[in-house]
């Protein structure tokens, strides 16, 4: 019973949950990104895609595709995690506060959840089950 209230972390379980979180959120975001990628590749009219930054509809779509497809793919494998979540955080900030900013919370809820998860991953990093961990382990200086 006392263990329920313990604040000690189980590193193995924490690393496994970071992997599950990364893999799940990446796959979910890829679902959003694939549709945008298909729109971009098909040469369809992009004038309906929001342009909140004033850089053009096609450029805005391209930036969203980069974040939601490329960065999500890299996040899935845990490569440069803290770097690749930055475009995802930026995309979610734009989606939540600019694109859906005037709508009720229900329209902003999913983007807010993604934003919180990406902020968490920015702080924690990818965990042990990632390419980042493998690279860091190989390049980490030894203490003499």
Please describe what each predicted stretch is.
Residues 41, 53, 91:
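Short, small-residue-rich loop/turn micro-motifs
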Residues 1-38, 58-66, 70, 76-144:
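Extended, low-polarity transmembrane helix blocks
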Residues 38-44:
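Membrane-interface loops
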Residues 44-57:
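Perimembrane loop-to-helix junctions flanking transmembrane segments
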């Amino acid at each position: 019973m006392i263990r329920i209230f313990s604040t000690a972390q189980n590193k193995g379980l924490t690393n496994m949950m970071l992997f599950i979180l990364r893999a799940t959120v990446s796959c979910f975001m890829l679902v959003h990104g694939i549709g945008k990628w298909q729109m971009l590749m098909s040469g369809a009219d992009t004038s309906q895609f929001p342009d909140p930054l004033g850089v053009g509809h096609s450029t805005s779509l391209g930036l969203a595709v980069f974040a939601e497809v490329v960065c999500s793919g890299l996040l899935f494998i845990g490569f440069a995690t803290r770097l690749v979540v930055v475009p995802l955080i930026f995309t979610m900030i734009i989606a939540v506060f600019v694109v859906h900013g005037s709508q009720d919370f229900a329209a902003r809820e999913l983007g807010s959840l993604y934003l919180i998860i990406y902020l968490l991953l920015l702080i924690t990093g990818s965990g042990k089950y990632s390419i980042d961990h493998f690279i860091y382990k190989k390049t980490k200086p030894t203490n003499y």
